[in-house]
UniProtKB/Swiss-Prot annotation:
Consists of three domains: the N-terminal catalytic domain, the anticodon-binding domain and the C-terminal extension. Keywords: Aminoacyl-tRNA synthetase, ATP-binding, Cytoplasm, Ligase, Nucleotide-binding, Protein biosynthesis. Its main location: cytoplasm. It comes from Clostridium botulinum (strain Loch Maree / Type A3). Its EC number is 6.1.1.15. This is Proline--tRNA ligase. Belongs to the class-II aminoacyl-tRNA synthetase family. ProS type 3 subfamily. Homodimer.
Amino acid sequence: MAKDKKFVEDITPMDEDFAQWYTDIVKKAELADYSSIKGCMIIRPNGYAIWENIQKYVDTKLKEYGHENVSMPIFIPENLLQKEKDHVEGFAPEVAWVTHGGDDELAERLCVRPTSETLFCEHYAKIVQSYKDLPKLYNQWCSVVRWEKTTRPFLRTTEFLWQEGHTIHETKEEAESHSLKILNMYSRLCEDMLAMPVVMGKKTEKEKFAGADDTYTIESLMHDGKALQAGTSHYLGQNFSKAFAIQFSDRNGKLEYPHYTTWAVTTRLIGAIIMVHGDDSGLKLPPRIAPTQAVIIPVAQHKEGVLEKAKELKEKLAKVVRVKLDDSDKMPGWKYSEYEMKGIPLRIEIGPKDIEKNQAVLVRRDNREKTIVSLDEIEIKVQEMLDTIHNSMLEEARKARDEKTYVATTMEEFEDIIENKPGFIKAMWCGDRACEDKIREVTGATSRCMPFEQEVVSDTCVCCGKKAKNLIYWGRAY
């Protein structure tokens, strides 16, 4: 047996250094690597395969809803970006500019797209004339560039992958309904695929997307008590339509401006998976999003019949799950640690004694429970166990979030919680931006959302003591 040249390295305990724990998992689980360009990353096959599964879910849903995929240019002329004032002001600090083509200075600077509203609007203005042309439901899978000052793989990078949807509608009601429909789909993605519970709600005026009338969001809570914005959907009203002169003849022959929505999820969802589910042994992947759902590890594979049986088992299971057989010459113990670190949801062990008894041993990654199953029932048992693992991981994440969700009715309580018990803080707000600004200045917490499911935890604003208007989820965030 060849000597193993690579051994599973220890991962920094999350309680010791959460940021280093996260970085260790990204690198050791081979999800991504650093690029020579500051703030950019190389998404490795293990990481990209997770993104592909996210893509598959979202793309299927969007097509069910009637969306079509398109591809817009990566460059935006400066004059086009300037057309919507609030929008350009919101993105100006993060824009990367192209000033030369070869040795020649360009007559006009080109922006490397930070987002594509301006390109879609320019196109829609050319192709929409009548209400019969509406709605237009377009989506794009691409990368965008935002020149971030502080970066971390998946969570905040200079270039990242996303999907961006851009739709225009005949009426405000239709556009708002569509925006919320997409948000609900994102929520289902997180809970049904990523086993990650979210809070759905609306952003405050201060936190909404630049140029939007309303921004809706799904917010999740990480192991360290910080919030992460997992996806957003924006109702842009007629702001962009007017700025770009997109008009259509309505049912009475009158010229009107369509109502616009835009929405996105990004590769930061991979970072969320790490920080919601991971532990000190490494990555812990929810089964439905895992590129490999089960790994077969033959025990004493040099003995007669073991490898043959393992291959037969793989062939059988490949019809129902995404399965891998590791028949390398590394020791079984090394393989156990390796696949535990990489987060494979289910390990299947089979050796000579198992073959004699017509059985295999299933080991769950989420809680390390072992179950012996008959080979005659293994296809259905593996599928059932993967569903059980998903439900267990979702429930565990929901329990962890709820245990770190607190209520504050005064600033003293708020400050004590944020410093000593990081998590979501539910607190009432008067609606005054000055209070929102003060809370951020004093505590570093931002308003994450006004949840759709409102409750009253106090009659007064947590900051100023005046009559409260809304419950807000607050927290420090990525």
